[in-house]
Amino acid sequence: VARQAAKDRRVDLLSFPSDPRKRFFDAAEGELASKALAALEINMASLLSLQGFPRVRLLSRLRWEVEIAKKFKVPLVISSGADNEYLLRAPHDFATLASLFDLPLSSALNSLSEVPQGIVERNRLKLSPSYVAPGVRVIKEGKDCPRV
């Protein structure tokens, strides 16, 4: 399912569970996501709620996935994933936590603000009446531009 989602241009965000055995973001997935303009979500709730060896294993996996994302220029989105108020943190706190998986502070802040904003703007463009297909927009309508 993850491979098919990474190929599909309608998919904006690839999100995986915290269990390392169920995470499938590898080099092939990274290449497909890069071509389809999909971003990789890093859910911080699992990082905050896990303890001991499972947290260490998740951090190791996140380091590996961030390296793959950098290699294939796949944008990262850091999300809180909070399902209660105790998992909420300030954006700068999440950016600092991202240093645990080798993401520089500037990139982490970008993953918290600019990348999600870009996804929202891209989707708003798709919802506009002038949007036809990727790379195709209606520029002018009128008598000299008959509709088919």
Each predicted region: which residue ranges?
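Charged catalytic cores and adjacent phosphate/nucleic-acid-binding surfaces used
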Residues: V1-V148
